[in-house]
Amino acid sequence: MNFLNFSILIFAYLLGSINSAIIVCYIFRLPSPRSVGSGNPGTTNVLRIGGKVPAAITLIFDILKGLVPVVIAKVLTGNDFITACTALYAILGHIFPIFFGFKGGKGVATLIGTLFGFSWILGLIFVITWLCVAIITRYSSLSALVATVIASFSVIFTSDLQVAAPFLIIAIIILVKHKGNIQRLISGQESKIGDKAKAKNDSN
C-alpha cells in the first residue's frame, strides 16, 4: 500500500470519527443522544430528541462522512478495492470513533454516503429499500437492516468478490451493532418512526 492509499484510509477513519449527532445535540442544547432514547448517537435518536431540523443536519453530515472520502479515493486512486476499503474505514470511524471513546453510532447513514460514492445505483437501491420497508412497518431499524443487507450484497453483482468483501464486512458490523434492535423487534418492543424519546433504560 502506498502513502496516498494509506492517507486516504486514515482520513476516512478520522472524518468518520466526528460524531455529528453528539455535536448537533450540543449546539441545539438538547440532551445527549447517548443518555436518552435508544442511547445511540445517530439520526433516528436525534429525531426523537430534537425533531426534524437537528435530525436532518445529523443525517446530512453523516452521509457526507461516507460520501466525501469514497469520492476522493475513487478520483485519486481509480482503484475499486481501495475505494471499497475507504468505505469500510469511514464506517469504522463512525461506529468506533477515536474522538468519542470508540463508542459511536450504528453506521447506517454513513453507509448511504459510501454507497452513493461508490455507485449511485447501490445508493439508490439502499434508499428505495429503506423507504419501502419504513412505509410498510414504520420501523427505522428494520428498514436499515434490510436495506443494508440488500445493498451490500448487491455489490457482488457489480464488482468482483475482492471489491465486494469490504461492503460485506460493513454489513456484518452493522448487523452486529443492531443486535439490541433485532431483539426488540422480535419481542415487539422496538420503537417506531415518530415515537418520542424516553430516558435510556435497560432495553437499549
From Swiss-Prot:
EC number: 2.3.1.275
InterPro entries cross-referenced by the UniProt entry: G3P_acylTferase_PlsY (IPR003811)
Subcellular location: Cell inner membrane
Entry superkingdom: Bacteria
Recorded topology in the membrane: Multi-pass membrane protein
Residues annotated as transmembrane: 8-28, 53-73, 81-101, 116-136, 155-175
Enzyme class per UniProt: transferase
UniProt pathway: Lipid metabolism; phospholipid metabolism
Any GO MF annotation of the entry: acyl-phosphate glycerol-3-phosphate acyltransferase activity
GO cellular component terms attached to this protein's record: plasma membrane
Keywords: Cell inner membrane, Cell membrane, Lipid biosynthesis, Lipid metabolism, Membrane, Phospholipid biosynthesis, Phospholipid metabolism, Transferase, Transmembrane, Transmembrane helix
A biological-process GO annotation: phospholipid biosynthetic process
Catalytic reaction annotation: an acyl phosphate + sn-glycerol 3-phosphate = a 1-acyl-sn-glycero-3-phosphate + phosphate
Signal peptide as annotated in the record: none
Described function: Catalyzes the transfer of an acyl group from acyl-phosphate (acyl-PO(4)) to glycerol-3-phosphate (G3P) to form lysophosphatidic acid (LPA). This enzyme utilizes acyl-phosphate as fatty acyl donor, but not acyl-CoA or acyl-ACP.
HAMAP family noted in UniProt: PlsY
Family to which the UniProt record says this protein belongs: Belongs to the PlsY family.
Quaternary structure note: Probably interacts with PlsX.
Protein name as it appears in the record: Glycerol-3-phosphate acyltransferase
Taxonomic classification: Bacteria, Pseudomonadati, Pseudomonadota, Gammaproteobacteria, Thiotrichales
